[in-house]
C-alpha cells in the first residue's frame, strides 16, 4: 500500500457512500449523546455482505483502525445502519 493516496469521505445518513471499489483502512465515528449507537457497513447495497458491524458508546468519537490491507469493498461502501450516530468518516485507499 505504500504510495497509495488515502481519501476521506464523510457521511451522515444511510445509503451508498459513492466511493466505488476501495479498501477501508480506518473509520472515525461520532455518536449521539443518547441512544444505542450502531454502525453496520455492507458491500454495495443493504443486501450485500456485511463487512463491519459495531456497537458504540454514546457521546463519543471513536476511531476504528483496520489491520493489514484493510477491508475490501468490491462495489462500494454501503452504510446500512447509522443508529444514533452523528457522522462517519471513512479513510480509504
Residue map of PLM features:
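Surface-exposed, low-hydrophobicity beta-strand/loop segments enriched in small/polar/acidic residues
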Residues: 1-93
Amino acid at each position: 500500500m505504500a504510495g497509495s493516496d488515502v481519501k476521506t469521505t464523510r457521511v451522515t445518513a444511510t445509503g451508498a457512500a459513492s466511493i466505488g471499489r476501495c479498501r477501508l483502512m480506518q473509520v472515525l465515528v461520532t455518536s449521539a449523546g443518547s441512544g444505542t449507537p450502531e454502525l453496520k457497513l455492507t458491500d454495495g447495497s443493504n443486501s450485500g455482505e456485511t463487512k463491519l458491524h459495531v456497537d458504540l458508546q454514546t457521546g463519543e468519537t471513536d476511531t476504528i483502525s483496520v489491520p493489514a490491507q484493510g477491508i475490501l469493498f468490491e462495489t462500494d461502501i454501503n452504510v446500512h445502519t447509522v443508529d444514533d450516530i452523528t457522522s462517519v468518516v471513512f479513510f480509504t485507499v
